[in-house]
């Protein structure tokens, strides 16, 4: 199958040009002008549009069981929503397994979840929920099997202590894997939460007050120092929500430490005032939404290159689940927001169309750097001969208002309801096949492929 995309502006992280793009058998074969492919071929007119590499979202939680609830998006509805929003690859953070389980236990479970449902290509981050010799010995074997990143938690049920973190950092570094971490100070959060609950303060706003930015920033600083102690182990901070943590990361980067960081659209565009609305439970996630001052600091990091990746942390619990389980108590509410369908459009509208970032920087944040950090480059995150034919076409002339009834996830609400975006996703191709066009999804469950990722190689800092 041949596809010729004509008359668009093709954008990669290192530049853009008005040129045509030829995809054959799912692979980019040629870029340039006056391309004359062999018949037959499909021609797509991208006049006036940007032609970007398909998005790579390296932080989703599909089909996750958090003990009190299971998220309402599985690998079909989640990847369907992703591709309708211009994302053609996801790397899912697997949930915790049973107490004492092997490291690969969850990989086997999650490959079963995704195998016959994923619409687009996918991989997983390993999850380290306890440390012993057997777990450490499994790490290099899993890297050989194509899992080159693993997640640690400093909070929740399976949080690691500093000694366990050091052991994990060392073995992951030795094995060619990247350590990712959810950084929040669990003891400080538990103390604040208990204080509020004892006083009967259980409204949504106390979720944010129980997890102040200092809890996140302290844990970021601690992880940076532990990574240095562990032999300058590479480190990736997930879902950054505040400027103080970013300051610590800037300092580490200035000292040439291999650290990288992602943020999410919710921390750039939503703020803590959402907790005081009638539907405040809709916005329970961790870290919580911050104030507008913190948003501004994150936008500075987006603009000046201090932030490397924009992902989503898509973790969908319906409003019905939230209300039934929480019964008005923030501490009982399952955490997470939907957003995998909105990431590309929101960042394009609020970033590119406002002049905060260039189209090239948009590519770097949404596909190129995620692919480089997580062992998918140059197969993903790039439009060049030999790369996969993963493409998203965005028309900057179109304006759209986000309405949940038009979205493709399995939630019953959107935190972005009513947001007006300048720029519309008009077509998404996965390996050369159009599976979203002008509002219509045409993909099929099970067409996505598991991606064996290469061992971690640090991009130049």
Curated annotation (Swiss-Prot):
It catalyses: D-5-phenylhydantoin + H2O = N-carbamoyl-D-phenylglycine + H(+). The keyword Transmembrane helix does not apply. A divalent metal cation 1 binds at residues 59, 61, 151, 313. It comes from the Bacteria. Binds 2 divalent metal cations per subunit. A divalent metal cation 2 binds at residues 151, 182, 239. It is an enzyme of class 3 (hydrolase). Pfam families: Amidohydro_1. One of its GO terms (biological process) is pyrimidine nucleobase catabolic process. One of its GO terms (cellular component) is cytosol. SUPFAM superfamilies: Composite domain of metallo-dependent hydrolases (SSF51338), Metallo-dependent hydrolases (SSF51556). Its cofactor is a divalent metal cation. One of its GO terms (molecular function) is hydrolase activity, acting on carbon-nitrogen (but not peptide) bonds, in cyclic amides. Keywords: Hydrolase, Metal-binding. InterPro entries: Amidohydro-rel (IPR006680), D_phenylhydantoinase (IPR023766), Hydantoinase/dihydroPyrase (IPR011778), Metal-dep_hydrolase_composite (IPR011059), Metal_Hydrolase (IPR032466), Metallo-dep_Hydrolases_sf (IPR050378). Substrate binds at residues 156, 286, 335. Catalyzes the stereospecific hydrolysis of the cyclic amide bond of D-hydantoin derivatives with an aromatic side chains at the 5'-position. Has no activity on dihydropyrimidines. The physiological function is unknown. NCBIfam families: D-hydantoinase. Belongs to the metallo-dependent hydrolases superfamily. Hydantoinase/dihydropyrimidinase family. Homotetramer. This is D-phenylhydantoinase. It comes from Escherichia coli (strain SE11). The gene is hyuA.
């Amino acid at each position: 199958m041949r596809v010729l995309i004509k008359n668009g502006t093709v954008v990669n992280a290192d530049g853009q040009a008005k040129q045509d793009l030829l995809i054959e058998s799912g692979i980019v074969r040629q870029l340039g002008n006056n391309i004359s492919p062999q018949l037959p071929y499909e021609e797509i007119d991208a006049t006036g549009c940007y032609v970007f590499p398909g998005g790579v979202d390296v932080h989703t939680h599909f089909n996750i069981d958090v003990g009190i609830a299971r998220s309402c998006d599985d690998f079909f509805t989640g990847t369907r929503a992703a591709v309708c929003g211009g994302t053609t690859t996801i790397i899912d953070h697997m949930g915790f397994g049973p107490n004492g389980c092997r490291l690969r236990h969850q990989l086997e479970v999650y490959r079963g979840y995704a195998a016959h449902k994923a619409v687009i290509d996918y991989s997983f981050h390993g999850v380290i929920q306890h440390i012993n010799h057997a777990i450490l010995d499994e790490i290099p074997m899993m890297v050989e099997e194509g899992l080159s990143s693993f997640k640690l938690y400093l909070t929740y049920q399976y949080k690691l202590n500093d000694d366990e973190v050091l052991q994990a950092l060392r073995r992951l570094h030795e094995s060619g894997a990247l350590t990712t971490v959810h950084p929040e100070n669990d003891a400080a959060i538990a103390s604040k939460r208990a204080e509020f609950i004892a006083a009967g303060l259980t409204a949504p706003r106390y979720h944010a007050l129980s997890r102040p930015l200092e809890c996140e920033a302290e844990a970021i600083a601690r992880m940076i120092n532990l990574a240095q102690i562990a032999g300058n182990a590479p480190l990736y901070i997930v879902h950054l929500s505040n400027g103080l943590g970013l300051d610590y990361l800037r300092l580490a980067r200035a000292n040439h430490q291999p650290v990288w960081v992602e943020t999410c659209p919710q921390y750039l565009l939503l703020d803590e005032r959402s907790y005081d609305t009638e539907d405040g439970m809709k916005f329970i996630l961790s870290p919580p939404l911050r104030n507008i001052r913190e948003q501004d600091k994150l936008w500075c990091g987006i603009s000046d290159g201090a932030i490397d990746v924009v992902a989503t942390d898509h973790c969908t619990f319906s409003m019905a689940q939230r209300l039934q389980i929480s019964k008005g108590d923030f501490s009982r509410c399952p955490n997470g927001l939907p957003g995998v369908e909105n990431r590309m459009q929101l960042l394009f509208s609020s970033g590119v169309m406002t002049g905060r970032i260039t189209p090239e920087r948009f590519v770097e944040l949404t596909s190129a750097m995620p692919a480089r950090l997580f062992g998918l480059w140059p197969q993903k995150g790039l439009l060049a001969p030999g790369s996969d034919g993963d493409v998203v076409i965005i028309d900057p002339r179109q304006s759209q208002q986000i309405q949940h009834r038009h979205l493709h996830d399995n939630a019953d609400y959107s935190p972005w309801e009513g947001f007006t975006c300048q720029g519309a996703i008009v077509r998404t191709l996965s390996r050369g096949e159009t599976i979203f066009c002008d509002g219509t999804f045409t993909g099929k469950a099970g067409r996505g492929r598991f991606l064996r990722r290469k061992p971690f190689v640090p991009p130049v800092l």
